[in-house]
Amino acid sequence: MSHYARYFTGYPKDIVEQALRLIENNKVRDYLISKYPNAHDVTSDKLLYTYATSLKKQYLKNEPPFGRAGFKKQGDMITNALGTHTYRMQGKTRKHDLAISSDLMYAPEPLLRALVVHELAHFREKEHNKGFYRLCCYMAPDYHQLELDLRLFCASLSLGDNPYSRKK
């Protein structure tokens, strides 16, 4: 089986086969562009902070505020992670930090939203359990489809093709 199957671990066999067919037939770019024609405009740490804070205020009003949010180079990220959520205690106050892979700086907004929602869900649920995914779906009703499309986007990146990169 293709080494791209690792992106789709845990998915039903028919979904994995469809995804691998898209990859093998070089159709991932076409699929993504037809579904998500434009990249988002969140292209700085400040804009990411504003974007993530607005989602947090809308869905997680009672959770503590962010300390920081920013894009990080892959070398600065945990292996194979597109995003990380960390928190630290300062006295009695908990500070949350979000780090999103800089690969997502040039991606469609729904895929960025899926990743930010995923990291925000860790504010309440530390583990990837039913409650965690229920919270993700509360914040993004189409979360499961977005997560699958995000995995296709990652496969496209590993092929060296970002359909949304802004070439100069």
Walk through the language-model features, giving the residues of each:
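Walker B catalytic acidic pair
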Residues: 119
